[in-house]
Amino acid sequence: MKKALIVIGVVVVAALACFVACNMVNNEPVAKKPVLYLYPQEERHLTVTLDLEGSLDTVYPAPDSQQATERGTQASWMVTAAPDGTLTDRAGRTYPSLFWDAYMPLPEPDSGFVVAREDAVSFLEGKLAQLGLNDREAADFITYWAPRIRAHEYTFVSFDASAYTQAASYHFTD
């Protein structure tokens, strides 16, 4: 019987939603598919800085700056955020979100759900609606995570954000 552990965290802070998901790869915690959506009340020019305990793997779009720190890694993006969630970089390219994944220290979750392969999509649709994700965010989340959950007969899924909030934080400046 194939089993997997997937920790999926969802944090909603004011008008921001940050999806962080992680799983164990070779017994090493890996943050997978964290996506930051920004929804300001009015268009804003922002510098978004990720302060990470760990090392970045994939980042998109490329940050304007990235450096090693005593803690791990720091990456910053300079974007214009629109109320509809569109992010525009200094070159004028647009993006729906900021994405990164990383190797970082994460504890195993204390609570969650055991999801059967055949229930992956309906489970995610229900939980993401309860968490307040909009259709675009939910579709992005489900199209990434449903195949990974369905790859195993049963998967343990947790939405416990406390598993990663100390290892990764965002700072926003005008």
State each model region's role.
Residues 25-174:
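Protease-labile, long low-complexity intrinsically disordered regions enriched in Pro/Ser/Thr
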Residues 1-12:
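N-terminal Sec-pathway targeting helices
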Residues 13-23:
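Hydrophobic alpha-helical membrane-insertion segments, chiefly the h-region
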Residues 4, 15-16, 134:
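Solvent-exposed, charged interface segments at domain starts and junctions
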Residues 4, 21-28:
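Serine/threonine-biased, Pro/acidic-interspersed low-complexity stretches characteristic
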